Amino acid sequence: MCDLFSDGEIRKESIAQIVNERNFSRVKSLFDDAVAQGATVAVGGQFDETDLTVHPTMLTDVTPQMTILQEEIFAPLLPVMTYDNLDQVIEYIEVRDKPLALYIYSQDDSSIEKILSRTSSGGVTVNGVFSHYLENQLPFGGVNQSGMGSYHGIFGFKAFSHERAVYRHVN
């Protein structure tokens, strides 16, 4: 995000609108709650209520008690938590509802594999954000509380189609 928006200038047409005022207020409330509890705005943080836009925003110094880490956001807000060891991260993920998406930032393949083998989530992007959703050749969907089934491309076609089995005995 810092590389993309380092000059602070984002063209208005490149920012997606939040679907309606109710959801805009929900997203703004998640942001305000996090900042009020000590989160730091590392990038972004601009909200425009007149056209319901939110600039891509990264929050650091985020804690598990903040509402932003307890709900699915569905907006360009990226809360970032730090940790002391990998087992701490895995435990954090395991004791909560399965997330719709999991973003892993690491150059260490063994750490990435350890997280993947010990956690469950909808989709995963390694060293990026949202890419698994944007790739139509990959299924997209959640697990348990975050949804069921897979969508996108052929996966969505199959999910919303009924395959009718017919077995005919030959006399």
What annotation goes with each model-predicted range?
Residues 2, 46, 53-171:
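Conserved C-terminal structural/oligomerization subdomain of aldehyde/semialdehyde dehydrogenase
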